[in-house]
Amino acid sequence: MASRQPEVPALEASGPLGKMSLPIGIYRRALSYDDTLEDPAPMTPPPSDMGSVPWKPVIPERKYQHLAKVEEGEASLPSPAMTLSSAIDSVDKVPVVKAKATHVIMNSLITKQTQESIQHFERQAGLRDAGYTPHKGLTTEETKYLRVAEALHKLKLQSGEITKEERQPASAQSTPSTTPHSSPKQRSRGWFTSGSSTALPGPNPSTMDSGSGDKDRNLSDKWSLFGPRSLQKYDSGSSTTQAYRGVQKPSPLELIRAQANRMAEDPAALKPPKMDIPVMEGKKQPPRAHNLKPRDLNVLTPTGF
């Protein structure tokens, strides 16, 4: 093209170092801006009387420009410049408002769906008893999940208290009223009970009379969990029950005394018993012959052979 300049040494006088802005000998191709533009017309310097030439600004037809200007309250540009773009923007105005409304609706729907999924997961995992505290940013509509959780928690507490109250007269009725020495406190039976209660799933041991004592004791020994245990005696005078201590463990001093008494009484009792070992009377068993077959010799032979 006519505006393309030949390659010249890059000697510029406008730099801060004068003519030595680039070293001499380094060539730089003068850039033609026409190569990068779609318009093939060459670039010309602006005319000297630029202020007297009437010109219109080129306004790009962007999508939401008119809506943004209306929202910001800016004054619209002159109508001849905005003819095409305002027509396009007026067509696009309704879908923009619709898109904003659907954006708000989708946000609320997504938040609601998230809360429902959280509630469903907590219900499955059994975490609803502790209640659900909403996030600070949640709206008042979503705080109903907190109210639902609290209501469920209170309902469960009330039903639990009712069942406990119903259970107490039933357990009181299950204890026979003709018991001479009844325990002053209702105790729940369990497998591993501590203190006064015995681990007998059968009848109450305090109701057994002395006539059938041996028969009932054998039956309780048969059905008790940890073998025969001494029966519980209740003190009728005091309100506290006597704790079961089992067999008293002897102290080491008592053990030494008992051993000394036993040695003094019968010294032969502490001697170890004699073991009757049959003596071999010179009979030696003949050595057993190996029952080896020729194929087994391959296993016993070292690998070097």
UniProtKB/Swiss-Prot annotation:
An example of a GO molecular function for this protein is: oxidoreductase activity
* Biased composition regions of type Low complexity, renumbered to the chain: 169-183
Bias (Polar residues) occurs at 191-210, 233-243
Region described as Disordered: spans on this chain? 1-20, 37-56, 159-305
Give one Pfam family, short name only: P33MONOX
Keyword terms:
Cytoplasm, NADP, Oxidoreductase, Phosphoprotein
Q: Does the keyword Mitochondrion apply?
A: no
- Class in the EC hierarchy, top level: oxidoreductase
Q: Which GO terms describe its cellular component?
A: cytoplasm
Q: Where is this motif: Flavin-containing monooxygenase motif?
A: 67-77
The UniProt entry, under InterPro entries, shows: P33MONOX
Q: Which residues are recorded as modified (Phosphoserine)?
A: 182-183
Question: Principal localization?
Answer: cytoplasm
User: Subcellular location, in the record's words?
Assistant: Cytoplasm
Q: What is its EC number?
A: 1.-.-.-
Q: Which residues carry this modification: Phosphothreonine?
A: 44, 175
Q: What does this protein do?
A: Potential NADPH-dependent oxidoreductase. May be involved in the regulation of neuronal survival, differentiation and axonal outgrowth.
Q: Subunit notes for this chain?
A: Interacts with NELFB, NOL12 and PRNP.
Q: Which PANTHER family match?
A: MONOOXYGENASE P33MONOX-RELATED
Q: Which family does the UniProt entry place this protein in?
A: Belongs to the P33MONOX family.
Q: What is this protein called?
A: Putative monooxygenase p33MONOX
Source organism per UniProt: Pongo abelii
Q: Which gene carries the instructions for this protein?
A: P33MONOX
